[in-house]
Amino acid sequence: MLLRTILAATATATAAVTVLLVPATAAHAEPTTTAAASSSTAEATTAEAAAGANPVIVVGGLIGISIAYEPIAARLRADGYRVSIYQLPNLGFGDIRESARALSSYVDQVREATGAAKVDLVTHSEGGLVSRWYVKFLGGAGKVDRYVSLGSPQQGTYVANIINFLGLGSCAGIVACQQMSIGSGFLTDLNAGDDTPGTVRWTTVRTWQDELVRPVDNAALADGASNVLVQAWCPLRIVGHLGLVLDGTTYSVVRQVLAGATIRPNCFAV
């Protein structure tokens, strides 16, 4: 029952094997006061940026189908971005390194189809780790401009450790679950040295109510990333792990990052 609950909650992998494209800085982003709604100037800046922007690939997480990420993809399309959704191979159950190799091929397909030199990655949960492995070890640093992770266990999550502790078949035989355990060999390799390599612009978004990434601060990166805690800006905002891809405030951060605008989450967005 516990495993079913956890797996259902993580139902968050994404996307298509086909390319569905529709035309249309190094400080932590933690404030001391709550931000107000985005100004009309910021909205205009975002719209202008989208017109000539990189293609955006939404990279999903463990267990899920493409449709789970259609809401955030639809928001991006409405803002003028060319968007595709990438579903992890085998629903993300397998080796994250293998998923990263598959993502590498997918990125090349998108670049060829669009003529773009680089893409932007908007990732959720396990998808953030898949994307980081691709950037760090598989040549993605020269092909990715912006990286945004939503609730990705960058330093692991003790939820995976608990499953192991309970003896549920070593994460019930799920390789990716084992790799997301705090202290795993996979995470040791991924986080060794600079955890934000290359010229990629790195941003993470996390929420206090994340029931799957615990401790919550394990969803942040250390070296040169903008790390956004939703409740640092919007203390009354309640957003869970799955809610990060549906939440308006979270999306306001995504669109600001993609537009190269200053990060000021809109606490009133729906």
Predicted regions and their residues:
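Secretory targeting and sorting signals
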Residues: 1-31
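N-terminal low-complexity, Pro/Thr-rich disordered segments
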Residues: 20-51
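Serine-dependent carboxylesterase/thioesterase catalytic core
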Residues: 54-60, 67, 82-86, 97-193
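Active-site glycine-rich loops that stabilize anionic/oxyanionic intermediates
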Residues: 61-64, 208
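Secreted/periplasmic proteins that engage bacterial cell-wall peptidoglycan
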Residues: 62, 77, 91, 99-102
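Conserved alpha/beta-hydrolase
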Residues: 73-93
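Surface-exposed patches in mature extracellular/periplasmic domains of secreted proteins
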Residues: 89, 93, 115-121, 160, ...
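Helical cap/lid subdomain of alpha/beta-hydrolase-fold lipid enzymes
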Residues: 136-270
